[in-house]
């Protein structure tokens, strides 16, 4: 179940989108769905592609590129894992956005509460205006959809 009201905070130019979902699977399974690239691509927005820089890893210092697959442009976010411990992965990114994407698996009685916190700013004022005008609400909706897809992927792993 998704948290009833997604949190959206705008502090100066920094914005925070935070959402959570309850998943009926252990935190280790949920974490595996985030950390393993093949499983990640089962729930990631189909318009996004995550490419490793070097070997794929979610260890601190590991780098990757998130590419938005739109015709002609393919904007890219360069990301680095900056925090990592069991149940937690935090990517820091730069590109048209600058910020952090936090994925935290919190064990609960019947599974896991997965928290996704996207803290960012858009440095370019023209791109910021376009994002806030046209894409901010869609981004939050997509985050909710990704959490629902991740829930399905994680819960399906239990049947294997």
Give the label of every model feature segment.
Residues 2-59, 160:
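Hydrophobic ligand-binding cavity/cleft-lining segments
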Residues 12, 120-160:
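A conserved amphipathic terminal alpha-helix motif
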Residues 41, 67-115, 119-121, 152, ...:
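Hydrophobic-ligand binding "helix-grip"
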Residues 57-59, 68, 142-144:
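Short alpha-helix boundary/capping motifs
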Residues 58-60, 98-99:
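Short acidic/glycine-enriched loop/turn segments that link adjacent beta-strands
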